[in-house]
């Protein structure tokens, strides 16, 4: 039986106690590796509980934390979906490393792996650049590639609202600019989050979850655009450890990945940067949250496990 521990550790911002989960396989199962998960925007780490329990049955320890401004890391009276006034992206990436240090100390002899979903995939990409060689394999799920003109334009808009209303503010204009197009691909829409999943029950659970779905702040948009720009620069891409295998895995109908095109572009960029072992897996008919598509869940879980098993 899986044993899940909950604990807190200090964020690199020097003030926030981050909530973390550690799911440990039954002691009768041989431990093979540790997988650290970085979750997406406007959600929380406990949404990955079912996936963690599956991997526990395969002997893989699973851990993750709620990012700054998310889930149970949000302090009372704090601003949801907000990394902070300054250096937010840096803090979020450094927090991933903070948990990595805890895990690598506790499980010294086990391979350390990482998986990032959506915003977590972009944080993971920054992590692979800033902390090369710390992880023995990486999975980038629900990721994409943004054209330079979109990053430049989006950054100008975000900065305008940031200086006008502050980083903790929200903007309907920016939210529509960032996410509105995602849902239009699936019109007529049943909800504002149809783009997440073809599984209506999953979408409804997301909407009903009080720790999901809050509008991202202007500050987080600014931070994320800056992080994506950092990730896509060739001068940074070549800083990654070329020997760290990477799996790009997404739904073919995921608008975050431009219906597969942005995922392929990211995959090509990693190969061009010298990463030796890059795998691409796209699922026809699946949207953004491929772990939560019940019709294909067993297949997706199994494919991820099979890929990890090449290295652990």
Predicted segments with their positions:
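Alpha/beta-hydrolase active-site loop
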Residues: 84-104
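Alpha/beta-hydrolase fold nucleophile elbow
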Residues: 106-118
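Active-site glycine-rich loops that stabilize anionic/oxyanionic intermediates
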Residues: 32-35, 39-43, 118, 252-253
